[in-house]
Design a protein with these regions (language model features):
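Small-residue-enriched alpha-helical segments and adjacent helix-cap loops
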Residues: 5-151, 182
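Charge-rich, low-complexity segments
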Residues: 1, 132-134, 184, 192-198
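Internal alpha/beta scaffold segment
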Residues: 161-195
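FAD-binding subdomain of flavoenzyme oxidoreductases
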Residues: 133-135, 144, 154-161, 166
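Gly-rich Lys/Arg/Thr-decorated short loops/hinges at beta-loop-alpha junctions or inter-strand turns
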Residues: 2-9, 163-168
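Short, compositionally biased low-complexity segments
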Residues: 71-79, 155-164, 192-197
Length: 198
């Protein structure tokens, strides 16, 4: 099957699935794969034995329950991940899933960042404990409140777990939420222009 099978990856926004979506994914596993999929640490599900000729049918099926396979491979911004306890954690400043969704919508099919030097990973966390491992992502965002109660972010850059693992460095102690996307866009432009492509 190596010559005709492909891996299909589907992002799960913030790791949250409805029961309808879970049943839909189970149907894809049953009808197009070997009866199961693999949940990844990047909050995706992978099907590893998809026949290439069936890929259009799978994409159509995903769309029927509001899912897709956009930006799950290649040198682009990947699925934005969040704290697995987001929305329920006792120590969170605010639910980070809202911001993860905003970043996802901003980055999906962004024409300027469709061919980056390498795949690019963003994580967001809102708790005192960093359960999203933001220090090990290209951009790590930690939700914070200013002294006057304004929502913002501590921004970390340069983390990774690839062939040269490294811990991210703090780039900004506090960026107001209203400036988040323009700040991210600036980081992405620098990376796109100056990042290594070898």
């Amino acid at each position: 099957c190596k010559t005709v099978c492909i891996c299909s990856c589907t992002p799960i926004c913030c790791g949250v699935l409805s029961s309808h979506q879970m049943r839909g994914l189970a149907g894809i596993a049953r009808d197009f794969d070997r009866g199961f999929g693999h949940f990844t640490t990047r909050q995706n599900i992978q099907f590893n034995w998809i026949k290439l000729v069936e890929a259009p049918d799978i994409l159509d099926r995903l769309a029927s329950f509001d899912m897709h396979a956009i930006q799950t491979s290649g040198n682009c911004i990947r699925n934005v991940t969040s704290d697995p306890l987001a929305g329920a954690a006792h120590d969170e400043v605010q639910d980070p899933r809202i911001w993860a969704e905003i970043i996802r919508q901003w980055s999906t099919l962004h024409p300027e960042f469709a061919f980056l030097p390498r795949k690019f990973k963003i994580a967001i966390s809102a708790g005192a404990e960093d359960r999203a491992a933001t220090a090990f992502h290209d951009i790590g965002l930690r939700l914070a409140l200013s002294r006057n109660g304004e929502t913002g972010f501590r921004v970390f850059v340069g983390g990774g777990q690839g062939r040269t693992p490294r811990v991210a460095r703090k780039l900004a102690h506090f960026i107001p939420a209203r400036h988040l996307l323009s700040y991210l866009e600036s980081i992405m432009r620098v990376y796109n222009a100056a990042g290594r492509r070898d």
